[in-house]
Amino acid sequence: MNKLVNKNIFINKNNSLKNFVNNYSTKTNNNNNNIFNKNKNDLKSFSSSSKLNNNNNNNNKYEESKLMNAEDLILNQIKISKSPFVKIAGSDIDGILRGKYLDKSKFESSIKKGLGFCSVIFGWDSSDSAYDNVKFTGNHTGYPDMGARPDLSTFRTIPWEYDVPLFLMDFIGTNGEPLPICPRSTLKKVIKKCHEHQFDPVQGMEFEWYNYSENNKSLLNKNFSNLEPLSNGMFGYSLLRTSQNSEFMNSLAELQGFGVPLEGLHTETGPGVYEAAIRFSTALESADRAILFKHCTKEIASLQGIMASFMAKPFKDLPGCSGHMHQNFNCLKTGKNLFLDESDPNHMSDIFKSFVAGQLLLLPEFLPFFAPTINSYKRLVDGYWAPTTPTWGMDNRTVALRIIKGGKATRSEFRVTGSDVNPYISIAASFAAGLYGVINKLELKQKPIIGNSYDLYKKGLVERLPRSLAESTELLSKSKIAKEYLGEEFVDHFVETRRWEYRQFNHQVHKWELERYLEII
């Protein structure tokens, strides 16, 4: 008998969920790789994954489910899932997924009524230390609940966790509207602004990360030093190193069936460093995929005794980890790449040039969105293929914006971001900066940089990007454009969280200080 296993569902996000039912076409084979597929090439569609029960009796049930509306169809798949729970998750300000398990009945009620989450999710840092400087929540408010609502379009199941259903969620304010400081809602706000001008922001993300043969207990026992990398030596693009860790590589391939399709996966320069390229998609879907990739890579790695780290610069003498973003605007109506103009010597349209001009102009004051931690700025140093100036060039990896001529795939590579970013925030801010340039028809006055860009600021030809989180945060706090495009409440909250972050760092006595001063001063 044919086995029905729904491994990938492609849903057009511009359609209502009711249209979800009509998007199905089925295939069957004996390898449980049946695909329910709506135009894979449509960047307005996205993939999420789930499974239908394999019992033969369910063939008729599936035929009946076609008659259901989309919400009922998803709920039906939840009901026949073998898992008693559904997992829901949402992003905090640092890009960490916070969530919990719900039983099926509780999840079903949350679709209509929403559910409560303690507001401390936006009231503490990545170490769960409570902020003392944010307005949204704290002792002064009593840490009340805030609302949350699962986004049904993000439905997938977790292959390495007994196919537990998973949904991403948006946080909701007391007025029932999107919470202004929710990173995912902030990205939606920027996307809406783009759509108002008939621009569809699309992008693909790349991540580099370190892998160690460690776990959280061994990290503490070793005091975070003398860590054992998954493989020794530098060896970028090494087939030998990937084959030596083929079990881990094959486990990461499970992300394909999880709705996080990888275009490429290889070793990068550095001991135990890997890089993955996530398939191009719409801005929101790209952000969903990116945050799930980071979280789930950690889960998959831990099951094999590996600790995956997306810290931007773990060690001063080794390369940092990037989170590059490949971006362009498509026409919202036709899907045409609006960055391409083949009559231009660099194949750059006027829209593309203004987009780049906007990003270059706003990069210094928007920098905390792209370099959000103390450690981020240890990566942004000369000579390590990370930019230190607001510059652009054609296929130049020393600049902030690398322009890639690729016909219909013509795009920019935003190289400032490290792997420590919150994808929702970095994508929102980068497209907001580009959109500002396009709306205001900014002229791209800076010439493309040829060769080494690192010496330019030393010669006074361009400005140096801020060197610390403290410096960049104070620039951001004064940015009227950031508040206009991302929302004043979001920017004010984000600024205070970054002030808290560098204040915590400044209060510490570091090993370097002890080694330098303890004996000799």
UniProtKB/Swiss-Prot annotation:
Residues 183-521 form the GS catalytic domain. It catalyses: L-glutamate + NH4(+) + ATP = L-glutamine + ADP + phosphate + H(+). GO terms for biological process: glutamine biosynthetic process. Its EC number is 6.3.1.2. GO terms for molecular function: ATP binding; glutamine synthetase activity. Disulfide bonds: none annotated. InterPro entries: Gln_synt_N, Gln_synt_N_sf, Gln_synth/guanido_kin_cat_dom, Gln_synth_cat_dom. SMART domains: Gln-synt_C. Residues 76-176 form the GS beta-grasp domain. Transmembrane segments: none annotated. It holds the Pfam family Gln-synt_C. Keywords: ATP-binding, Ligase, Nucleotide-binding. Belongs to the glutamine synthetase family. This is Type-1 glutamine synthetase 2. The gene is glnA2.
